[in-house]
Structure formats: C-alpha cells, structure tokens
C-alpha cells in the first residue's frame, strides 16, 4: 500500500512538473509577429539605433554589420500601475555587469517597450569598431540586466546599399549606415547613409523580414549652409500625419526640419524633402517625441547645443517651404526653448504624458559632432511639457 501511494505521489509530481514546464514554455513561446522569429545566436557587430514593433519585437540597427536585427524580447506583460524609471549611474551598473570600468561603456540609443514600459538601451563595451554590442533592459524598479543574444528568437535583413567603411574619412560613413529607425504600418523605416550618389537614404523594409530593397535617397535645402544637400544623413525622425497625408518629419545636423511624403519613398527613388523649419546652426538633433497636450500637438526635440525644444505642431501644413538663405539663424515653425532640461543625451516616449531621458555631460568634440557622453549617465522620467 505504501509503495502504491509513493508511486502515485511520484506520478502526480511528474505531472505537475510537466504541466509547469508546458506553462513556462507557452509563456516563452513567441506570439503574433514574434512567432516568425527563430531561436539561435543573434550575430551583432554593433548596436545602434533601436525601434519597437508589435508583440515586444525590438529592432536593432547594426551599422557595422550593415543589417537590421529583430529580437523577441519576451517582454509582453503590461505593468499593473503607472511606471516611473529613475536610475542614477546606469553606465556604472552596466559596467559592473560586463566587468569593465564605466568609461568603457557607451550608450547609443534608448527606447521604451510600449507594452511592458521597460527601458531598453543599445550600448557598447569598449570603444571603436571592435567594441562588443550590448542590449540592456532596465525595469521600473531600477534593475539593470543584459538581454542575452546567445539563444533568442530573432531574424535579420541585410541592407543592399550600405556604404563601405572608410577609416580615413572625417566621419566613417559605415558608422552612419543606420542613424535612426521607426516601425511604421508594417515596415521598418531606416534612415542613414547609402552607397548611392545621393548618399542620404530612407529605407522601408517590410516586417517579417524577407529581403531589403535599396532605399530612397534624399535631397534637402539647408538654409544655414545656403545650398541643397544630398550627403547629410537624417539624424532623427518621426512618422507624422499632416492634413491627412503620411509624412516623415526628419531633423538634420545644423538643424533643418524637413517633411518627406511617405508615398514617395519608393526603392531607388530620388526624393526632395521640404524644409519647414531651421532650428539653429552648430547643433545636432538627438531624438524627437510627438505628443498631444491640452488639445494641442507638439514635438519635443532633444539636441546637443540647443537643449530641449518644444515645437508647435498644430498647423505644420501652413508653413511655406524654406528654399533660400534665411536672414536669421532660426526660421519656419516656431518653438520654445526649455531651459529646465540639461545635458540630455537620449529621449524616448514612455506613455501619453511622460518621457524618459538619459542625461550626462557632453563628450569632446564640436556640438554638431559630439563624442560619447561623459558619465555618470542617469535615467529619469519627466512629464511631457
């Protein structure tokens, strides 16, 4: 009788263990668009621009590898309450995880998972082309962890028009293959440089990934330079609807703001953007966050030398194109300078009322081409102004 009871207990225990294993496996099984990803080691040569798609899929721009990599973060649980992320010395915490000093950590981009509200950072262990790429997750409790790339559902697509490396150039074009990304209506929009005559490019890549066609290349009027330009990459952009039409609002170094019709961004097309604002020279835009507050539309723009700007976006369709040298350094769409935000290095939307910023002292170099920020680097939640 005792033996029989023991066997029954063992059988029940095994059944519970199997059921638990199935439950865990089901919880980890990719869903939605993430189900198209396959487990294995994600091969990244660098980790730069980030963007989130549906179902917790994180897109990583790998400029050195000339590819975009989609990762299943397995991070699809919504928080039970309002999230505020505040972490002092996040670079110090990352350095401790990988066994280096904080000055060997460079944070390249910041995005918030729209489902879980966890913060994701692309970073590098070391400096230069041989640096080790890292993807870092920070939760609302301030816990910092690495997203393992060794066995993760993923997929990648190679860019057919990536520029060749040129270490003798003032700024290596290969390192600017991907400068910013956004997921827009089933496509990953990828800004950066290409190997075309008009080297400034915007690529539209359908997801799930199959192949990437060549991007559209761009020409813009740069009023502070007094000329049309085709070689300067978009630094940051957001999709935006103006009078019912889909546009890309793109910001460039020194600092034209340009609208580009999405309908014209066909493979191989040469597209002329329309400059609608000149925000000021001697500056590099870092990130943009569009939002609505008190019945009005705004775009918050983080910059290297201009600080944080609050752009009024209610009537973007009413501003005439800027296509000739301007008398002043600032023209077009009006904005307010926000002096209460200092040393912002990264900006990302958290929800409809808040954003997350990464702050740190500016690195060496001119403000339009700054070096890596100097730590300590801090994550902070702010209210959208």
Give the location of each predicted region.
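N-terminal secretory signal peptides that target proteins for export/translocation
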Residues: 1-7
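Helix-centric, low-specificity signal for extended rod-like, repetitive segments
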Residues: 2, 21-22
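General helical secondary-structure elements
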Residues: 5, 24-25
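Bacterial N-terminal signal peptides
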Residues: 11-21
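Sequence/structural signature of beta-propeller domains
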Residues: 25-385
């Amino acid at each position: 009788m005792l033996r029989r009871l023991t066997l029954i207990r063992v059988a029940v225990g095994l059944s519970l263990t199997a059921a638990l294993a199935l439950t865990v496996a089901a919880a980890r099984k990719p869903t939605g668009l993430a189900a198209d990803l396959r487990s294995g080691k994600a091969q990244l040569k660098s980790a730069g621009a980030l963007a989130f798609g549906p179902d917790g899929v994180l897109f990583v721009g790998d400029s050195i590898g000339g590819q975009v990599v989609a990762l299943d973060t397995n991070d699809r649980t919504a928080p039970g309450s309002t999230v505020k992320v505040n972490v002092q010395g996040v670079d110090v915490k990352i350095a401790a995880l990988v066994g280096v000093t904080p000055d060997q950590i460079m944070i390249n981009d910041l995005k918030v998972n729209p489902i879980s509200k966890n913060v994701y950072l692309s970073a590098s262990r070391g400096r230069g082309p041989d640096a080790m790429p890292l993807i870092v997750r920070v939760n609302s409790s301030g816990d910092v962890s690495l997203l393992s790339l060794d066995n993760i559902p993923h997929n990648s697509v190679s860019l057919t028009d990536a520029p060749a490396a040129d270490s003798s150039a003032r700024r290596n074009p290969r390192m600017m293959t991907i400068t910013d990304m956004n997921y827009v209506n089933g496509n990953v929009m990828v800004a950066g440089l290409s190997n075309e005559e008009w080297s400034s490019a915007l690529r539209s890549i359908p997801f799930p990934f199959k192949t990437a066609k060549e991007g559209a290349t761009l020409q813009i009027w740069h009023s502070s330079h007094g000329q049309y330009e085709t070689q300067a990459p978009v630094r940051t952009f957001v999709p935006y609807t103006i009078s019912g039409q889909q546009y890309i609002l793109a910001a460039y170094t020194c600092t034209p703001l340009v609208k580009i019709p999405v309908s014209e961004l066909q493979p191989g097309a040469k597209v002329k953007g329309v400059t609608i604002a000149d925000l000021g020279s001697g500056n590099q835009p870092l990130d943009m966050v569009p939002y609505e507050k008190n019945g009005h539309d705004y775009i918050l723009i983080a910059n290297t030398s201009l600080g944080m700007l609050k752009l009024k976006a209610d009537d973007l369709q009413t501003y005439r194109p800027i296509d000739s040298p301007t008398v002043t350094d600032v023209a077009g769409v009006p904005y307010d300078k926000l002096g209460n935000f200092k040393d912002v290095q990264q900006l990302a939307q958290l929800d409809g009322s808040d954003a997350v910023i990464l702050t740190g002292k500016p690195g060496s170099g001119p403000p339009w081409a700054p070096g890596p920020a100097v730590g300590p680097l801090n994550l902070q939640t702010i209210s959208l102004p």
